Amino acid sequence: MIKDERWEGVYSFEDSPYLMETLTDLRKIGTENISFRKGLVRLGRYMGYELTKTMEFEKMPIQTPLEKTQGVFAKDRKNVVIITILRAAFPLMEGLIKNFESAKVGIVSASRGHAPDFNIEMNYIKVPQLNPEDTVIVSDPMIATGSTLIHVLREFKDSKPKRMMIVGVLAAPEGINAVKAEFPDVEIFVTKIDEKLNKDGYIVPGLGDAGDRAFGEPFKVSMLPQMHNLE
């Protein structure tokens, strides 16, 4: 895990050959949906493990079958809330939660419009009660403009949890700048920080639309009436 000196509290995993190989597979245009999803799960699991190293723990006395000794209790690991942004973040969350088995989970449905406005639409939020001792992890594969994450974080800023993190696959400097400008204390962990955004608001070189690549291209709204006629 590498601290990026351009920002406070921003980290990447560019020093991990395993994650870089997994990211390479995700970038390839020919990677199938199932392989893409599995790759996101692997990234989430590895990054979740690395996050546990940043959490507080305390020593505690325990009794083994042979004698008394000292054990470790990672108390922060028991107070995790993972907030997942539909839909591409589901595989990432699946990997994360393997490190935080008792985590509570929140779901947010949010989507970003097209250039030049990039308007954000949020139509569903279901999040557990947040407490002062909680570590909140917002999972979103792509930190592009940062506008979606900013809208999500605004919903919870008054809860004042112990820590607020964003875990993603790729980020653009523009997105990190936007998030940090409004939420300077939020910690950001991504597999890699890419070069920039293009005129359409996509990260480049990037990996395309993570949701479509993980789950397939969705039906267009205009096609929904045709679905009813199939019965």
Swiss-Prot record:
Question: Which Gene Ontology BP annotations are present?
Answer: UMP salvage; uracil salvage
**What are its E.C. numbers?**
2.4.2.9
Q: Which cofactor does it need?
A: Mg(2+)
Q: Does the keyword Disulfide bond apply?
A: no
Q: Name one GO molecular function term.
A: GTP binding
- Pathway the protein acts in: Pyrimidine metabolism; UMP biosynthesis via salvage pathway; UMP from uracil: step 1/1
Q: Entry's InterPro entries?
A: PRibTrfase_dom, PRTase-like, Upp_A, Ura_phspho_trans
Q: Keywords in alphabetical order, please.
A: Allosteric enzyme, Glycosyltransferase, GTP-binding, Magnesium, Nucleotide-binding, Transferase
| Reaction equations catalysed | UMP + diphosphate = 5-phospho-alpha-D-ribose 1-diphosphate + uracil
Positions bound to GTP: 38-42
Could you say which residues bind 5-phospho-alpha-D-ribose 1-diphosphate here? 87, 112, 140-148, 209
The record's similarity note reads: Belongs to the UPRTase family.
Functional summary from the UniProt entry:
Catalyzes the conversion of uracil and 5-phospho-alpha-D-ribose 1-diphosphate (PRPP) to UMP and diphosphate.
What HAMAP family does the record point to?
Upp_A
Q: What is this protein called?
A: Uracil phosphoribosyltransferase
Organism equals: Methanococcus maripaludis (strain C6 / ATCC BAA-1332)
Tell me the gene name: upp
